[in-house]
Amino acid sequence: KHAVEWLKKNENYISDIIVYLQVTSLFRTKSMIDDCIEVLLNNPELDSAFVGCPVHKNYWKKDGEKFIRLASDIPYGHPRQLKEPLYREETGLALATRFDVVMSGRRLGENCYIIPFVNELSFIDIHSEFDLWISEKVISEKSILPNEK
């Protein structure tokens, strides 16, 4: 928000679409960014578009002293591969959102579109020495550079 406000105040520049990229999420593709922008350009009713990783696991949250299964509307007990996926939000990899959303103090608006992606490196999000070590191993041993995979 600070950068958007600064551009408006100091450069009299207002962008229709703001792209958010988290520096700790290294292994994104250029198409992730392009796809998020393209979705907003083609769908003016949308507030935000971001990449999300489909997952077929069961998720639970603690509610007081008990645990509640999330997405309880998805049948339980079927093989994971046959289940309707949930989507893990990956806005750090690629998010495009509208100016008004950012100015309201949020990254995501109410009306969002998720671009599904599967990337074996998406779990790498640098927040510890171990995360940095994993990233360095991928770069040195697999010759995969940040923002290219």
Where on the chain are the PLM-derived regions?
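Hydrophobic helical membrane-anchoring modules
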Residues: 115-149
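Conserved core of the sugar-phosphate nucleotidyltransferase
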Residues: 1-6, 11-17, 26-120
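Helix-loop-strand module that forms the ligand-binding subsite of alpha/beta enzymes
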Residues: 23
